[in-house]
């Protein structure tokens, strides 16, 4: 047996059906779409249409709503600020603002900023912070360290 004598088993490789290639092909003229009507035209996909039965979107109940006045917060942890201080990206003499946090890469957009104190039980640096919101524990830790919230 040689490489040029190899061939596929019968039925292993099936040619795809070529539609709209003449009447003799069996799928010519109307190309299997029937005669006239909406589904015989091009661009037929009707989103959500289930052939007359009530669509899924109407069978399921409405749930909840999106409040348009919800405030979106960037969450930042005291631990991250402490790490930025030890790395030298922030200094204790300056007021820490949202713009400064964007500049050093701790947050990446202009949404409101909320300071949390997850997994932080002590904070030693006296900082001046001007952010949009603070958790009660974060407030307590900063004021205990001699910092101030503007």
UniProtKB/Swiss-Prot annotation:
GO BP terms in the entry: translation
Keyword annotations from UniProtKB, A to Z: Ribonucleoprotein, Ribosomal protein, RNA-binding, rRNA-binding
Claim: Flavoprotein is one of the keywords in the record: no
Recorded GO MF terms: rRNA binding; structural constituent of ribosome
InterPro entries named in the record: Ribosomal_uL15 (IPR030878), Ribosomal_uL15/eL18 (IPR021131), Ribosomal_uL15/eL18_sf (IPR036227), Ribosomal_uL15_bac-type (IPR005749)
A matching Pfam family: Ribosomal_L27A
Entry function: Binds to the 23S rRNA.
Domain of life: Bacteria
tRNA processing listed as a keyword: no
Family: Belongs to the universal ribosomal protein uL15 family.
A GO term from the CC aspect: large ribosomal subunit
Subunit and interaction comment: Part of the 50S ribosomal subunit.
The protein's name: Large ribosomal subunit protein uL15
